[in-house]
């Protein structure tokens, strides 16, 4: 998950407050109703992406470049079936496991320096509880036994050709 805030330097503290509130206190706001709403939102986003021209290409790439069981074999958003099956307790556990400062990167760019930012980051994120220690994902770089040629048919105005390679550091 990526969150971006584009704010003037004068709003840095407000942006840090908002992000620390999301990271540290969202769990209390998760309800059956809010989860149901978000499942609907994400399902619609998935359908919109799938129904765009060439929208199914990414799935074919992942499924054909990475073997079953590899963490990159499936698209991040999952399937509509996965989304429909998700329960409030699943969201809460995921939040507890992964939504913490020990599993996050905060990047500040622009007219700000470390001497200004560090005290504000400490102020707003200092009391946010760590999540569990997340073990590294086992994502070996697979080797295809032979070249693959996959042809997808879609109602699009132009042919598009994709050539994919799996390389170290990008897999």
Where are these regions (language model features)?
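M16/insulysin-pitrilysin zinc metalloprotease superfamily fold
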Residues: 6-38
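Non-catalytic beta-strand/loop surface segments
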Residues: 1-11, 36, 48-103, 127-171
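Generic recognition of short, well-ordered alpha-helical segments
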Residues: 17, 119-120
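Conserved short hydrophobic interaction patches
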Residues: 22, 123-128
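Extracytoplasmic/secreted cell-surface and envelope-processing proteins
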Residues: 114-118
């Amino acid at each position: 998950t990526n969150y971006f805030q584009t704010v003037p330097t004068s709003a840095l503290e407000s942006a840090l407050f908002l992000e620390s509130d999301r990271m540290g206190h969202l769990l209390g706001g998760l309800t059956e109703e809010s989860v149901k709403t978000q499942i609907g939102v994400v399902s619609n986003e998935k359908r919109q992406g799938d129904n765009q021209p060439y929208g199914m290409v990414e799935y074919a790439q992942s499924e054909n470049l990475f073997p079953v069981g590899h963490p990159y074999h499936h698209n991040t958003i999952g399937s509509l079936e996965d989304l429909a099956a998700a329960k409030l307790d699943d969201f809460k556990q995921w939040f507890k496991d992964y939504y913490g400062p020990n599993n996050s990167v905060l990047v500040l760019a622009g007219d700000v320096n470390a001497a200004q930012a560090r005290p504000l980051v400490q102020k707003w994120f200092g009391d946010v509880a760590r999540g569990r220690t997340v073990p590294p994902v086992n994502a070996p770089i697979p080797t295809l036994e032979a070249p693959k040629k996959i042809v997808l048919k879609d109602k699009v105005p132009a042919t598009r050709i994709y050539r994919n390679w799996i390389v170290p550091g990008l897999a």
